[in-house]
């Protein structure tokens, strides 16, 4: 390869890198997961795009093309409301993050979350589920649909973000904090209860079911969403 060709290739690489970096806001980095490496984030027509993105200090939220650029004006899907109150979502996410980090200590100094923003992927879908986990053992993430983020308190997000923080423990090499036991669901319910003391009223059916099933063993599968009370007792006895 001639010196001119090498110089041209180097310039092209630098230009491409500068375009990609220009889309990244200041502050923490946006991690690009392995399974999204082929997605062109600079293209508004892509499934995920910097054109449909919002950031806070600790989060990046991407939403699919079907929503359009303005989540408050998203078109209906099969007659269902798909709008999302983005300011409320961002505010709640930051509030939950602060408590899980600073009060519950789910992340410690040196965490990868100090480098990367946690990721929220909003799907233009009627699927009524939400998931919390991580990308590539690097950074906590959420995968959600509009019907799980259309209430003001966002109890579902508080629960699922709990799973993201549980996963972050493993991402940071601090131990294994996810999988294989109902204890992780109990923990997310307890985390939710801590950020919303009215949880037992908002989702009173969990309390009613627990009263009917409290005779089951501590980690019995029937109670994993109903019984954060042991964790609350431990925190009262030992402190957070």
Show the residue positions of the predicted features:
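Generic recognition of stable, solvent-exposed alpha-helical segments in well-folded globular domains
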Residues: 160, 226-229
């Amino acid at each position: 390869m001639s010196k001119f060709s090498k110089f041209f290739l180097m310039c092209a690489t630098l230009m491409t890198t500068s375009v990609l970096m220009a889309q990244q806001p200041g502050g923490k980095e946006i991690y690009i997961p392995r399974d999204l490496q082929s997605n062109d984030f600079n293209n508004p027509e892509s499934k995920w795009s910097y054109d449909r993105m919002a950031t806070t200090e600790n989060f990046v939220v991407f939403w699919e093309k079907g929503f359009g650029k303005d989540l408050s004006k998203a078109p209906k899907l099969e007659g269902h409301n798909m709008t999302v109150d983005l300011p409320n979502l961002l505010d709640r996410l930051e509030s939950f993050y602060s408590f899980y980090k600073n009060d519950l200590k789910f992340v410690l100094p040196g965490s990868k979350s100090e480098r990367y923003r946690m990721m929220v992927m909003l799907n233009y879908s009627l699927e009524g589920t939400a998931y919390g986990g991580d990308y590539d053992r690097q950074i906590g993430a959420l995968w959600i649909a509009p019907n799980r983020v259309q209430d003001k308190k966002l109890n579902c997000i508080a629960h699922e973000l709990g799973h993201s923080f549980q996963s972050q423990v493993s991402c940071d090499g601090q131990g294994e904090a996810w999988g294989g036991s109902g204890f992780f669901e109990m923990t997310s319910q307890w985390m939710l209860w801590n950020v919303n003391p009215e949880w037992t009223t908002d989702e009173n059916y969990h309390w009613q079911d627990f009263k009917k099933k409290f005779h089951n063993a501590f980690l019995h599968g029937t109670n994993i969403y109903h019984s954060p009370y042991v964790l609350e007792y431990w925190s009262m006895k030992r402190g957070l």
